[in-house]
């Protein structure tokens, strides 16, 4: 095969890969955001801090007043916390990906790793406290890219009553027990 068609084919392929992965966006290290978590009755339950790095977002969560055991922690698509937290909408999912860290399509190398807002479960101790630090590439704190949590209607972080099963189908994570609007810090 002549060299020019191969180069054109590679360029077109790289274009589609870049378009699917959010383009050529370079994150701005050092950007910060924070969400204060509140219960449906307005009690303060904790704080989630977000720090942009060159390769993703570091998330640091500290909570209290939760029921002991596992809880799904998920970024939702709208920055609104109404008394029942339903105004926060669905999971943040700018890539229109299938649900779950262990979705069969993702394990086959097809598509992206679940919803951008899907995070690891947190586990509350017997006294209701929970602390977790983890990293995600599912979203950015930069404004503008498609996978930014700071789009026109913002984003919220929700603590659910039960843990996420991480599977192909969205699991029954129960009621939304805490919500915080994510704001630039």
Where are these regions (language model features)?
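N-terminal leader/targeting pre-sequences
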Residues: 2-9, 13-70, 75-185
């Amino acid at each position: 095969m002549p060299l020019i068609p191969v180069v054109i084919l590679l360029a077109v392929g790289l274009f589609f890969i870049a378009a699917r992965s959010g383009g050529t966006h370079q994150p701005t290290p050092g950007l910060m955001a924070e969400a204060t978590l509140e219960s449906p009755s307005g009690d303060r339950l904790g704080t989630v801090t977000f720090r942009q790095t060159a390769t993703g977002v570091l998330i640091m969560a500290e909570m209290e007043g939760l029921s002991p055991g596992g809880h799904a922690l998920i970024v939702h698509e709208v920055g609104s916390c109404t008394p029942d937290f339903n105004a926060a909408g669905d999971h943040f999912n700018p890539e229109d990906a299938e649900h779950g860290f262990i979705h069969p399509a993702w394990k086959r190398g097809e598509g992206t790793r679940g919803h951008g807002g899907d995070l690891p479960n947190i586990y509350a101790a017997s006294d209701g406290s929970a602390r977790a630090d983890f990293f995600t590439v599912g979203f950015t704190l930069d404004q503008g890219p498609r996978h930014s949590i700071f789009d026109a209607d913002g984003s919220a972080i929700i603590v659910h009553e039960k843990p996420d099963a991480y599977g192909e189908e969205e699991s029954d994570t129960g009621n939304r027990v805490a919500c915080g609007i994510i704001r630039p810090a």
